[in-house]
Amino acid sequence: MNTTTPIFSKTDSLKFFRTLNSRVNNYFKENNLDRTGNWKLHLKTIVMFTIFLTPYFILLALQMPIWAYLLLNVVIGVGMAGVGMNVMHDGNHGAYSNKSWVNKIMGGSIYILAGNVYNWQVQHNVLHHTYTNILGHDEDLEAGRIMRFTKEAKWYKFHKFQHYYSVFLYGLLTFNWAITTDFLQMKRYLKRNLSYGEFKKPVIRWTTLIITKIIYFSIWLVIPMVLGVTWWKVVLGFLVMHYTAGVILSVVFQLAHVVEETENPIPDENGEIENTWAIHQLFTTANFAPKNWLVNYYTGGLNHQVEHHLFPNISHVHYDKIAEIVKQTAKECELPYYEFKTTRAAIASHFKHLRELGRQPQLA
């Protein structure tokens, strides 16, 4: 991870973001709307937690064949991803509610999804949203040697198969959160004195991490075993749950930034980025299936990543409305607005891009 901070240009001769901000602010003012969540988000919260937790209690209460047990764990995984995208995500961006304590509760749902609030806010809010698609700064591009997400990353022979094995690795996302990622990230972030908001003492961060991990594994592994579920069924179900959630979350994340159209800007020798932060988001981010109601609903507006990156503190329930404002403003300024009409088209572009990145680079 590169610790030299990139510097974005301060020159916006097009006045893109100033114009866009004014128009979006006018939209909320004219329609007398809060920028945070509303009753639609509150209802969706109930729906997503129901999908997530109801199968868990059924598994504890009833004896069932292995196929039914695993199927319910798939449903739990679907609900787990749904809670993460719709509830936890808005909460940790301060976009769920205009009350900070509500945001903390909703953001804290990450603890039963396998993650950690501090780590997520640093990786996502601080690093990813600030340095989007900049190798060495945006950790969403970091997958060790096994995946190559940018042309600047070192190439290995096995990368020519990455568009095949990537799906298997994507399924390990949340499992890794639970087992290793949180511990490695916390050590790294605390060493760099990184924080989103108040910087708390390391002992508080580590204590919170350890206690919440104990609670997490107690809920998903210990309690089912204590109540009589065979240990191997519990472990297998745990893996199925995580694989399901991991694939869903990874694919949704990748469709926003690792596709053919999006760019990976490189800082110059002075560490400077060519564009302003807002214009940088347009070049590095893409939407998909913006008119698909089900995709909009389930992904928590993460199919409107352009709007999310420009306005991370606005709840996703508003993205479909402000999207036209963003699109029109970008068009007027002759700036890109990347968008795939369908999820299928975005997925195809992602895996085609992985295949291209897996080819051996030609020597200059």
Predicted regions and their residues:
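Glycine- and acidic
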Residues: T5-I7, L33-K40, G91, M106-Y111, ...
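C-terminal, non-catalytic macromolecule-binding modules
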Residues: F253-W277
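Short, charged cytosolic
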Residues: T3-N26, F175-Y189
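Alpha-helical bilayer-embedded segments of polytopic membrane proteins, i.e.
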Residues: T36-G84, Y111-I112, H163-F175, K200-V252
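C-terminal, active-site-flanking charged/polar segments
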Residues: M241-Q254, V258-V259, V326-P336
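Membrane-embedded catalytic scaffold of the fatty acid hydroxylase/desaturase
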Residues: V75-K201, E269-P361
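Membrane-interface, cytosolic juxtamembrane amphipathic helix immediately N-terminal to a transmembrane helix
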Residues: N21, N25-L43
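Membrane-interfacial segments
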Residues: Q63, G91-A95, Q185-R188, L227, ...
